[in-house]
A protein has these predicted regions:
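Secretory-pathway ectodomains
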Residues: 1-354
Length: 354
């Protein structure tokens, strides 16, 4: 990997087909300019993160305006395409928000059909989807009727580290084999039957759950991801990774970094912000001797079980002199043949495969 570009004052970025699109304007956080890696696209008034590249066009929202704009990336022509503000884009749907009516529209990107709900959906189904609030996760149909709900109190508390506090969802991983998988704050992995909302599998790496018959005990789960290629759940911690078979709920594969790759990833004392991308995951790393914050990143090959690449992209001398460093809320991303990561001083670092 070779560094090819640094872009300063990047507030937020998205990746699409090997290129970064980003907003920037440190003096006006609510009316930013929108850029590609090569040029300025929209000079001002773009909301921080409400922009979504879609092939030759870009959907975006302007500050204090209830509309969705479309920008033709080839011609530069900009126009209003909807009187609702775009909120999210997935492979299946585009989500728009009507702030006056407080409703969410979900438009199927293939058929153009849509439905309107008072809920924000985190998972999509042919007749509705999965939503959540502060106390429960539930399934709704396209008319907004709740078909079932699963209260978070049923997850139980953590009576060792946070007694009395109810567990909650950290990440909804996806719907696989008619099961809704999600990970929780207290280190649990849960699968619910999407038809009934009943628990099918519960795994835990939390010491508080040892001895609880309802949980299958595994090593610490860390950060969990859905892997499309084999429809599995991959869980990555600073110690190693585990692969869960979603058809059985069993542990299909595990790896301890210090045993499998002692001279590669195993030599790091701390692994942060793992980010699964296909058969690889990227990460931030530190050793006990490091000072002045995180400066190193790496890529690990899950199939080969070895470190592919690592580099200290913010050297010790720079961290000491400027207090610049990497942060766990900004992981390393792969897009095409490039790598992207943003440091604490809002500089976007771009690398390319040699």
């Amino acid at each position: 990997m070779k560094p090819i570009k640094k872009i300063s004052d990047v507030s937020f970025f998205r990746l699409f087909e090997g290129e970064a699109y980003y907003t920037t304007d440190g003096s006006n956080p609510f009316g930013m300019s929108l850029h590609s890696e090569e040029k300025l696209l929209v000079p001002d008034k773009v909301c921080l993160s409400q922009f979504f590249p879609l092939g030759d066009t870009m959907l975006f929202v302007k500050w204090k305006e209830p509309y969705t704009y479309e920008l033709n990336l080839k011609t530069g022509v900009e126009r209003v395409v909807r009187d609702e503000a775009v909120q999210a884009v997935s492979e299946q749907y585009i989500n728009y928000r009507n702030t006056e009516k407080k409703t969410n529209s979900y438009v199927n990107r293939t058929s153009g059909t849509y439905y309107v709900l008072p809920y924000i959906l985190w998972g999509f189904l042919p007749d509705g989807g999965i939503a959540e609030d502060d106390t429960e996760i539930f399934r709704v149909d396209q008319d907004g009727n709740i078909l079932w709900s699963f209260p978070f109190v049923d997850l139980d508390e953590d009576n060792i580290y946070t007694p009395g506090e109810v567990d909650h969802i950290v990440k909804i991983l996806g719907i696989v084999n008619d099961l809704l998988w999600f990970s929780t704050q207290f280190g649990r992995l849960v699968a619910l039957d999407v038809a009934t909302g009943k628990v099918v599998y519960q795994l835990s790496g939390n010491p508080a759950d040892q001895g609880k018959v309802e949980y299958t005990q595994v090593a610490g789960l860390g950060d969990c991801f859905y892997r499309e290629s084999d429809r599995s759940i991959v869980c990555i911690s600073y110690l190693g990774f585990q692969v869960i078979d979603t058809s059985t709920g069993d542990l299909a594969e595990s790896c301890v970094f210090l045993e499998e790759d002692p001279d590669g990833i195993g030599r790091f004392d701390y692994i942060y912000a793992p980010n699964l991308q296909g058969d690889y995951f990227t990460f931030l790393a530190e050793m006990k001797t490091d000072r002045y914050g995180i400066g190193r990143v790496g890529i690990f090959d899950l199939k080969a079980r070895k470190l592919l690449w690592t580099e200290e992209i913010i050297p010790f001398e720079e961290r000491k002199a400027t207090r610049n460093h990497l942060v766990t809320s900004q992981p390393l991303y792969i897009s095409g043949d490039k790598l992207y990561i943003k440091d604490v001083k809002d500089t976007l670092h771009i690398f390319q495969r040699e």
